[in-house]
C-alpha cells in the first residue's frame, strides 16, 4: 500500500536532579496532499497519545502551529530567556572578556570530556554516549570544542550562519561569558542569538546588563500526561535554586483528575486528592498556570495568590538539540 500520512513518536528521558521523566517527542507530522481532509492526522495523533499513556509516559512535546495541536492537548508553555549579543555589546561592555588564549577547534578526541561535562547538568535530556556527537549535530549544526592553553574547557553548538548558539557547555559561569565574547569577536559576527533556562541565574544576571535584547518566551509546546510526577519533580528542582512558600493547594484538572500539592520547608509532595478542590482548570489552563510565564492571571484569589506566585511557573524547558 501507499503511505498516506506519518506521525513520528520519539521516546526520550528527561533527567531532573537524577530522577527520570519519560518524554515522547512528536515530529514528521505529515499528510499526502491528495489525502488531506480524510482524518489521517487526527487518527495517528490519537494513536500516538494512546500509546504514550499506555506506556506510562509523563510528558510529550512538539513544534508547530498552536491551534493545530491544542486539539490534541498540546499548548505553548515552559520558559526560556532569549538573548541577542552584538559586536557593539562586545566592544563596549564585554571586550575585557575576549581572550586570545581561547581556541575553537572542530571535534577532537576530547569527546569523552564533552560528554562528561554535559552530564554534570542537573536538568538534561539523557543522551547515549554512542550518539552524543550526532545529537550535537542535529539540525545541521556545527560543533566546536573550546580550549584554553591546550586544556579542554567546553564546547559550542552553532548554526551554519554563526547567528544562533543552541548549546554552550563550559566548566563554570566565568568561562561562559568569556567563550561567548571571544566567539563573537573571533567570527566578526554582527550578532548572535542564544537562550538560557530560568535557573541559570548568575548568567542571566550578567547578560541582562549588557545584551542588546532580552525576551521571555515559551520554551516549546508540551502536553502533560502525568501532572503529579511532572509537578513534583519540577518543583523539587525549583526548590534547589529558589525559596518556595509553605502551603497546600488542591487542583482539579478536567478530564484528568484531582491532586494536591504540599510544600513544607522546601519539601514538595504531590498526590491524588478526593474532595472539593481549591482550583478548577481545564487541561490547557492547567499547563499554562503551572508552566507558562504568563499563566498566573488564570487564578485570582487572595487566599491562593501568594502560593501560586511562589510555586509557579515550574521550570519546564527543552533544549534546541533535543527538540524533534
Tell me the role of every PLM-derived stretch.
Residues 67, 75-94, 182-324:
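Active-site/acyl-donor-binding loops of N-acyltransferases
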